[in-house]
């Protein structure tokens, strides 16, 4: 086997900046940034979305049948379209 071809596997601090939550996960991602977390200096990767802030996991998702563009269209023009069918 060839030596020195595998990426370094180490603990990395992923930071969800939206929810201000940290996840410590083993990863091979390359980053030059570091952060002090629980007394350890770890490689740092900022995230925009994770399970801490994604609407599917937080339960704050919108019901598109009630709040979507189709519902707004039906609210504006539904009576007009219903009258034309008669």
Curated annotation (Swiss-Prot):
GO cellular component: ribonucleoprotein complex; ribosome
Pfam families found in the cross-reference section: Ribosomal_L31
GO biological process: translation
Matches recorded under SUPFAM superfamilies: L28p-like (SSF143800)
GO function terms (MF aspect): structural constituent of ribosome
Subunit structure: Part of the 50S ribosomal subunit.
Similarity comment: family membership: Belongs to the bacterial ribosomal protein bL31 family. Type B subfamily.
Identification of the protein by name: Large ribosomal subunit protein bL31B
């Amino acid at each position: 086997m060839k030596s020195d071809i595998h990426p370094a596997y180490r603990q990395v601090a992923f930071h969800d900046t939206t929810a201000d939550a940290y996840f410590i996960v083993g990863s091979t991602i390359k980053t030059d940034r570091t952060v002090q977390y629980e007394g350890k200096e770890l490689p740092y990767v900022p995230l925009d979305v994770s399970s801490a802030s994604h609407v599917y996991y937080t339960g704050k998702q919108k019901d598109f049948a009630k709040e979507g563009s189709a519902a707004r269209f039906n609210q504006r023009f539904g009576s007009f379209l219903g009258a034309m069918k008669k």
